[in-house]
Design a protein with these regions (language model features):
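Conserved G/P- and acidic residue-centered "switch" motifs that form tight phosphate/ATP-binding loops
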Residues: 49
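ATP/NTP-dependent adenylation/nucleotidyl-transfer catalytic domains that generate, transfer
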Residues: 2-44, 54, 58-61, 66-72, ...
C-alpha cells in the first residue's frame, strides 16, 4: 500500500470538532443503539475508503473488534488498492471479516440483455447488491448493519436509496467529510486511506469529487452555512462563495429531500405509522398510549 503525502487537517474554525468529545459521543451512541435493539454486534461494508474505515475504528473502540464484522464486497472492476486498504484495516483492528465478490450478482442481472446500462445505473445496482449481502450476513452474524454515510453526502443526495444509505443506525451521519478526515486522523486510521481521493469505486477511475463537480472542502463550508447556520443564499454568497455553486448546492439539498425521509403513507385510519403513531425505538409495550 503506497502512502501519499500527509494532507493538512487544518479546518475552518466553524468545521473543526473536538475529536475526543466526538469519539465519546459516538461510542456511547453505538452502545446505546445496540442495547436498545437487544444486540451486541455490528457489521459493515468495508470498502477501503475513509468513511467505512472510520466507522470500523469507532465500532471496534466502542464494543471491541471481535464484535465487528467487516464485509469486503468487491466487483470485478474494483480497485485492487481499495481491497488492500480494507484488508489493512482488518489486520490493524483484528476484527473478523468476510469476502463476497458481487460480480456474479451484478453481471447475472445485466448480461446478456442489459449490457448497454450506463455506469450510474450499474453503480446504483452494485450499491443495492452490497446492501442485500450485508443484510443477509446480519442474520448469520447476529448483528446490526451499521451505516457509513457522512453528512455531506446525505445532504447533497450523493448516495443510493436502499443501497449505501441503508443501515440500522449511522454513527457518522452528522459529520461532514472534512470532519471525517479530522476524526480519522485522531483515531489512527491509516494515512494512505485518509490521503487518497474519495471514491465510491463504482467504476474504474471514478472519484466522488469529479463526479459531483466540486471539492468536499468547499461544499462543506457552504452546507454548514445553508443548513447549520440557516443562512440565505445571498448571505452565503456575501461570505465569499460563488453564487452559481451555492445555488447548485442548494438545489441538490432540496432535490434529495426524499432520500432522507421514509416513504409517505396515505392516511386513512385514526392512527398512522410514522405520522401520529410514533414511538422511540425502545417504546413502551402498550399500543394504547
Amino acid at each position: 500500500m503506497t502512502t501519499p503525502a500527509p494532507p493538512s487537517f487544518e479546518l475552518p474554525e466553524e468545521l473543526a470538532i473536538d475529536t475526543t468529545a466526538a469519539r465519546r459521543i459516538i461510542g456511547e451512541f453505538i452502545r446505546a443503539q445496540l442495547s436498545q435493539a437487544g444486540f451486541g454486534k455490528v457489521l459493515l461494508g468495508l470498502s477501503g475508503g475513509i468513511d467505512s474505515a472510520l466507522v470500523a475504528y469507532l465500532a471496534a473502540e466502542a464494543i471491541g473488534p471481535q464484535q465487528v464484522l467487516a464485509v469486503l464486497m468487491p466487483y470485478r472492476t474494483s480497485s485492487p488498492e481499495s481491497r488492500a486498504d480494507a484488508e489493512t484495516v482488518v489486520a490493524e483492528l483484528g476484527c473478523p471479516s468476510e469476502l463476497v465478490d458481487i460480480s456474479a450478482i451484478v453481471d447475472g442481472y445485466f448480461e446478456p440483455d442489459r449490457t448497454d446500462a450506463a455506469p450510474l445505473r450499474r453503480g446504483n445496482f452494485m450499491a443495492r447488491a452490497r446492501m442485500m449481502v450485508l443484510y443477509d450476513h446480519s442474520v448469520t452474524w447476529g448483528g446490526l448493519v451499521i451505516g457509513t454515510g457522512n453528512k455531506t453526502e446525505t445532504l447533497i443526495g450523493y448516495s443510493t436509496l436502499w443501497g449505501d444509505s441503508a443501515s440500522a443506525f449511522n454513527p457518522i451521519g452528522d459529520l461532514y467529510k472534512s470532519q471525517i478526515r479530522q476524526l480519522s486522523a485522531a483515531m489512527g486510521v491509516p494515512q494512505a486511506i485518509i490521503a487518497k481521493a474519495p471514491s465510491a469505486d463504482l467504476w474504474p477511475g471514478q472519484t466522488d469529487e469529479a463526479e459531483v463537480g466540486f471539492s468536499y472542502a468547499e461544499v462543506d463550508r457552504i452546507l454548514f452555512r445553508l443548513v447549520d447556520r440557516r443562512l440565505s443564499i445571498d448571505e452565503v454568497v456575501a461570505d465569499g462563495f460563488e453564487r452559481e455553486l451555492v445555488d447548485r448546492v442548494d438545489r441538490m439539498v432540496a432535490g434529495s429531500e426524499f432520500k432522507r425521509q421514509v416513504p409517505p403513507i396515505a392516511k386513512i385510519g385514526p392512527r398512522t405509522a410514522g405520522i401520529d403513531y410514533l414511538y422511540p425505538r425502545r417504546r413502551p409495550r402498550s399500543t394504547r398510549d
